[in-house]
Structures are given as C-alpha cells and as structure tokens.
Amino acid sequence: SNDSAEAGSSGDSEILGKLAGSLNTILDYAGSDLDTVTSFRQHVHAYKLLSDRASQDQDVALLRRQLTEEFYLLYSLLFTQTLEQPNIPMPVKMFLYFGYVDEELAGLKNAVTLYRMAEAMSDHSDIGVYTFYDWLMAIFRGKKSPSRNEFDQDYSDYIHKQKVGGNITDAELKALENNPMAKVNYELRNMFPQVNKITFGRITTFCPLFCADDVLKDLESSYVTVSRVSQILEEIRRIDYTAFYRESLDMEHIDVMGKETIHLEYLPDIILMPNVGIRGVMWQEIEGKRRNSPGRMVFSIFHLEDLKTTFTHLTGEFRWELCKRVQGNRWNDVSISSLTSEYFDYIQFYRKNHDLSTEAKEKVKSSLQRAKNSFKEMFVRDYMIWVLFEGAGSPRLNKVARQIMFTYCPFPEDICNTLAQNPLYSELLDRRKIKVAQGLHHLDVLTRKLQNGNIPVPETVEQERYYISGSKKS
C-alpha cells in the first residue's frame, strides 16, 4: 500500500534487511545441484569485483559466458523448486521476474524497487500478459505450447524427429508427449537464451544478471505494466483496427454459416523477459501450426525505448509474417493480391512506376539502402508511418505505399470521416465506400435469409459488420 511507500527510508531499510545476502537465499532455495551453485557463487563474486563489466577482454567475456550458462541452469532449478515449495522467498521471485541475483550488484535503491514490484506482482496470463515465469507456468499447465525452435520446429515436430532419428523409443516419445516439465525445458533451452539476449539488445556485452550498470532509465518509468500494454494495444487497434484478425470459417455455427468466411480477432500474447533492454521481438505470428491462435511478442520487463513505437514496429512485422504464413509460397506472387505480394511488387519495380515522382523514387531508393534491401523492413517502416502519422491525419507516404496500406490496413470509419477533408484520400475513400457497402449488403442478404428460415443470427455476423466497416454501429 501507499502508506509503506510514504514511510520511505524506514520501509526501505526493512526491505534491505530482508534482501541482505540475496544470493545465498536464492542458492539455498535452488537446492541440490551443488556444482552449479558453488561455481555460480564464485562467478558472481568475481563479476561484482570488476571495474568494467562490459569489457571486451577475453577473461571478462568468458566470465559473462559462464555466468550466462549457469544463470539458465539456475532458472530451471528454481522453476522446478517453485512447483514443490510454493512458499517462495522474495529474492527468488525477484530472480524469476527480473533476473535479480544480488542486492549490491543490482544497486540497493534498485533492489528495494524490485522488491516492491515483485511483492505487488500478480499473474496476468488470463489477459495475455506474462512474466517469463508465468509463461513457463502456462506451458507447464498445458495452457500454452512451447515456442518453435530456430529450425522452425514446434515441440511435437521436434520429438517426432528424435524418434525418426532413432534417438528415442516409441515409449519415450509417448511419455514426452505428455511430460509438462519436458515442454518447459524445451522453452528454456530454445526460446529463453535467444530472446533474453535479443531483447536486452547489446549482444556483445550481454549478461542475464540484473545489474545497476544496465539501468539507464528510472525503473518505474521503464516498467512494462499490464495497463501500459493494454493501453498501447488499444491505441494501435483504434487506428489499424483489423491488425489481429484472422480469416476463418465459423466452426461454432458451421451448420448455419457453411462456407461463409468470417474474421476472428486473436490478440497477441505478450511475454516479458527478466532483463532491462531496448528491443521488442515478434517471436511467432501463430502458435505451432494453428492459424487461429495468438501471436507471441516479447519485450524486456524494463523496456528503455518508447514502448508504443516498439509495439507498432512489432505489429507491422506481425502483419507481414502472418500474411506470408497464410499465402504460403505464393506470398510474393502478384497475380494473387495480398499485402506482401503487392508491397513486394511495389518495391521490386518502383523505378518503372509512373505513379511515383522522381523525388518519390529517390526516397524509396535511399530508404531501401537504409533497410539493407530488406522488403520486410521497408514495409515495417511504412507501416509505422501509417499508424503513427497518417492515422493521426498527417500524410507522409507516397501515393503507391498509401494505397497498399489503405487496402490492407484500413482505418476505421471515424478516421476515414476525418480524412474525407483531405483530397489525397478521396479516391481511396470512394473505393473503400463501395467495398464496405458490398460487404454489408452481403451480410444483410445472409441475415434476411437466416431470419426468413427462423434461424437465430450468430453474433459472428454482427462482429463481421465491424470487421468490414470499422464502425461500431453499421
């Protein structure tokens, strides 16, 4: 409560008392694996004594590598212990949430802040925001499946490949299929080390231990909270309102709806890595092979950059990757209209495009150089301009890019009404009006057909009206 915060230093010193010797508390709780524990303790001690922990000297780089390997072993040990000893000491919680190992390494003021944050932490997985510990718990409980590995194999691909390769027997395969801890370990082995490092952002000096040197911004202001995530997701969806929809058949009302396509929204799962970092990662656009499942986006739990900008970047990546996934190997075949095929065609042949001025062509050329010739990166940058600027009424894109964006990432009705004053959009808006009218007419016909047959109209039809028009009342 706020009373304790008001008490300030007396409360702080009480917390510091509880945090004294955090490393011992953590290692005692971890229990059995004495070699790892002893070695980790020595390495942490050596790391604390360094004057420059980011040094590129060989011995320092080696120490960081050893600490990194041991940290992940320890994370696995501690996770397993929490299943058996539910009374988790606060330093252990701080380790699992934030990568905290030692009050002096963290800086005493930071340690107190982390303590208060860990104390107030609750499980938010029901609304799709996970600390990494809660993410592993969701996998352990079978609510989520492990992420794909670097060879794009999900857990079941992987164990079947092991069986085919003769590494495991049929009985072992069966056991692994339903072994929750094996699934957790798959995530710990494949996803965690990679993504923890990428989100941290400074790859060459990476070390997963929470350290005062990495806190380049006040912890409270960089803390990624559920309310910040929800607010930003809401802001993006107010502009690109169809970002997280998937085309689908209405399986729940298949007898009534038949082959009628509908669109369902799957908001991404947000996973927060135990570090202070600068990058977000769009880790998966779908779960395993199921298209109708949430994507996975990952941030540092303390994100030093502007969260909305990073989030918008990831949403652009998500749109690109999902379109590629849905289109398969025809993702860049322009005879089949899609976001990726039209954008690919635009960048590939921009020099010959009569709709672009010489100046616009020059801009594309220099942007492409800056994006190291990556079409995806070009798209993501245009997407960010679309959401952050054009959606706010400030045109920045060229005519061709704007048309592609308007077609595949349309604005909702209220923004379209605002843009109607601007002649740059008039042709696009006219075309959209026709398309929306056709879509709504189709749904009207469907609705009347159902009503005439005394069949209740599924609520998915109402939702589809919103998908088509971007209007809550159409």
Label the predicted regions.
Residues 20, 40, 46-52, 64, ...:
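Active-site-flanking segments in enzyme catalytic domains
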Residues 2-3, 8-65:
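Sequence-structural signature of the catalytic-core scaffold of metal-dependent phosphohydrolases
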Residues 3, 473-474:
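N-terminal cationic leader/targeting segments used for protein routing and processing
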